[in-house]
Amino acid sequence: TLCELMRQLVGHGNYASISLADFGKDFMLEPLIHAQAVITDENDVGTYVDKAANLKAVVTGDAININRKFKVPLTYCFHGLVVQCLNEMPRIRDKSDSFYRRQLFIAFTKCFTGVERKYIKQDYLHRQEVLEYVLYKVLNMNYYSFDVPGACENVLEEYKEFNDLVRQFAEEIFPV
């Protein structure tokens, strides 16, 4: 539902859906050229991302090379928002602080199984007045950057341990 709201705000044709795994594959980044945001509802469970350099560069607006089928590759800087929805934490080969500092994990702990109200996603999020209200609130907030809540910092620490077997071992043997 959150991704649908974001897509409606950005507008059709102004977003791309590129999974975490696809950021490391040839020919999968061309949609970035026309996108203002990457909004991905689903990533495969159990995904292992071997190559994270493009993901890191896209998140921070650095230059990347985009290989295009039967066309000349081009260098491109993406200056949009990247949102990836996950059902479980992915394993990433890159365990550096430069990767971790680019991530903001937000845990959605509420479960709506059996009480899903599809009309919210299918009706409300497409209403002009709802979109105008949300956009007004976003544009009229006093902020320069995102604050990182303690809950998000905790999830990041959990993720660092989950993603790094050496760190897991150290936490078990040498608890703080």
For each of these PLM feature ranges, what is it?
Residues 1-176:
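Feature primarily recognizes SF3-like P-loop helicase cores of small DNA viruses
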